[in-house]
Amino acid sequence: MLRLVGAISLTLVTGGAFAATNDANVTRATLDNGLRVVIVRDTLAPVVTTEMNYLAGSDEVPVGFPGTAHAVEHMMFRGSPGLSKDQLLAIASDMGDSFNADTTEGVTQYFFTVPTQDLGVALHVAATRMRGVDMGAADWNKERGAIEQEVSRDNSSPIYKFITQLRGQMFAGTPYAHTGLGTRPSFDKTTATDLRKFHDTWYAPNNAILVITGDVDPGATLQQVKQLFGDIPRKTLPARPSFDFKPMQAQTIALPTDLPVGVAALAWRLPGLRDQDYATALVLSDALASKRGKLFEMGLSGKALFGQFAGSFMPHAGIAFALAGFPRGGDSAKVLKNLQAIFAEAATQGVPADLVTAARNNAIADLEYKKNSVPGLANAWSEALAFRDGHSPDDIRAAIAAVTPEQVNALAKRIFDPSHAITAILTPTSSGKPSAGKGFGGAESFGGAPSGTVTLPTWAQAAFAKLELPRISTNPSEFTLSNGLKVIVQPETVSKTVEVIGKVQTNQYLQAPKGQEGVADVLNSLFNFGTTSMNRLQFQAALDAISAHESAGSSFSLAVPSTNFKKGMQLLADNELHPAMPAQAFAVMQHNQEGALAGLIQSPGFLHTLHLDGALYPAGDPDLRHATPKSVAGLTLADVQHYYTQTFRPDMTTIVIVGDITPADAHKVAEAAFGSWKAAGPKPDTHYPAVPDNKASEFNTPDSSAVQDSVTLAETIPMDENSPDRFAMYLGSQILGGGFDAHLMQDLRVKAGLVYGVSSSARLQKHRGRFSIDYGCDPDKVAEARTLVIRDVKQMQDTPVTDAELHAAKGKMLRSLALGQSSFDSIANNFLSLSMQGKPLDADSIAAKKYMAMTAAEIQAVFEKDLRPGGFVTAVKGPAPK
């Protein structure tokens, strides 16, 4: 009743039109200036997401300037009148640094996920940026360098190259013919005036939809929105581009790739999100992606390394992708022929009715899972309103429910015409082995110290003046079954679903006999073949009957409507404890793994990682073991079964259950499903041993498909996951390379435009630690960027961080702990990680107190004691640095 009264009262504060809904948790309003607002109350966590959707993207850009909308998105982070760049970055960092933007075809999104108490600040930022943005020539010249690094990064991806060519052919003559990324030549011609014109034309309240989800007071929130946005004037919008899709012609694309396996692909044009046939296309896509379908079966029968199907939907059209993998040197023509045969059958004979029914039911059930994440819920509402031009995420439910097998088959016949297909073959190629570097020079004086103290706008100062411990709203129950299996339960009532994740703590490089490397990978692939009581198709049909998603292996998961939780857990346990492991399936999976490894061990990514690990760890370290075609070819089914028996133990397993379930019911169901599982013998040690300091070195791994270098500076550190100093290291790493306001980002991107992104991280294990800094840049900028990295690390050792930096980093770390509760998935994975490390489930509260008490001297001392600026291994993947 209180929610209803509150909803009715909102009509008094909108100053514009108000539309009631049947859901008391959903509030809608349209301000007088045309801004549409949707507020969805979600009490999952003390967290809120704001998504500002501007109904303009790469569709609306001028001819010849495909990246204009993308560039404007970048410049929105360079500041606005009344909100400087430094202020914006400081605010974003203070709120937890969970902010970003995304440019799509017809929509550009700006989103914040923040603790609830920071909602007002997030709204102030959005309103300020709608009013105007700073787009001076000097700022654009700097940001152009960063965005061109992003272009280089994506153009280094063979998949992106494929998508670019595909779109050019599939959507010729329409705005969809190009991606929104942009090109270097077009950015070289783009001026700051061009960008300002785009912003001033399209960034208007009557061309925007603001979605707010989280634990908020709808009435107070809407009042804030009106106060901040209500006086922004509406604008007269230009005509939007039209879409006149021409009949597709069959085309073939051939590309080299640095992927470890080859890919044969087929693509067709699908209906879009706003088309009448969208629901049918969605069900068709899900049916063809079914684990009971012939495409998925390709990866289980030996006809391909894998078979996948996906539908990618834009407002006015979609793309259907069918992919099949083949080993390096394999017969791509044969794989392609098998792939084509599947879709010829779908076009002429239709899709099996039972797969259509299961796909339809699963699509309806999946709507409920969108409620299990605060930012995910905002995305769902944004997609429904801004992309699909619908009323809510649920308004597609009736359309999906009405889809019939006959409609699906009619669409399949129309879509999968071979004369309309685009075919692609991505063939793995060698780029050469890693080679030692000659050292890196560079100007020592380039750049400068990070920005000094930033004075925040008055409307933001109070929010960050005082540090507060985060509100941790989770209250898990934990129990251990008689067989040693740990179960953690976090009840949540925001949806009628339950999500389960679990892990068996294993390590094949410590547990598998020498010469059997890869046994764990073959074992995990065999969980797709059903159980000892149900074959593969029967097992998947049982999951489909309860609209559940399940995976098994050393890591396992289940997502199921809460009414089917018991049955879902029974099926998960049956798969985990009684995998069928048929001999024929073993032979196929062994062959597939062998073929995949033949390409993997020659791929630039693998060679790069192998060489880096070899430079960090001593000879003979178990972390240097890896599977080879020979080690996998030598395995027997008995080897795999023995490894399973020895390593899959309940006393090495944790299960986390989050959702619409009580601890008592979860305990009862878990005991019934997993209680019969037994362990024999002493518990194994699955943790790598401690290692000494590494020696400094440099090397380059060639990658012929890359135009940009991926650079890692890494070294071993005398710290592990239980070291008392880890909190100082984490906080210091946050200041050094943890976000837009970090030293590295300021020096390498904001001031110099050398890189698109740069970050630092400390990866700690039970007995060893590793500190890394990663960035991507052009080959001629590697040395210059590295010089700045080393300088900034030394600065952390030589000079205490400022009070302002420490305060901001603490605020960010404290808020990030609150943001870790924003979804079922993040809650479950956090608890699973803590359990696997043997830490208490209230470790976040303990960490918060440690961060609150941290001093600049403690951070400086840890960096001085544990980091070695002259000890980094510099690993470059891509063209040789110049």
What positions do the PLM features span?
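Conserved GTPase G-domain substructure that encodes guanine base recognition and part of the catalytic core
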Residues: 70, 284, 732
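Short, conserved secondary-structure transition motifs
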Residues: 148-154, 244-258, 361-370, 562, ...
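M16 family metallopeptidases and their MPP-like homologs
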Residues: 40, 45-71, 85-129, 159-185, ...
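Non-catalytic, conformational "gating/processing" segments within enzyme and secreted inhibitor domains
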Residues: 144, 164, 193-228, 420-421, ...
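Histidine-acidic residue clusters that define the catalytic metal-binding segment
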Residues: 20-29, 150, 168-208, 236-244, ...
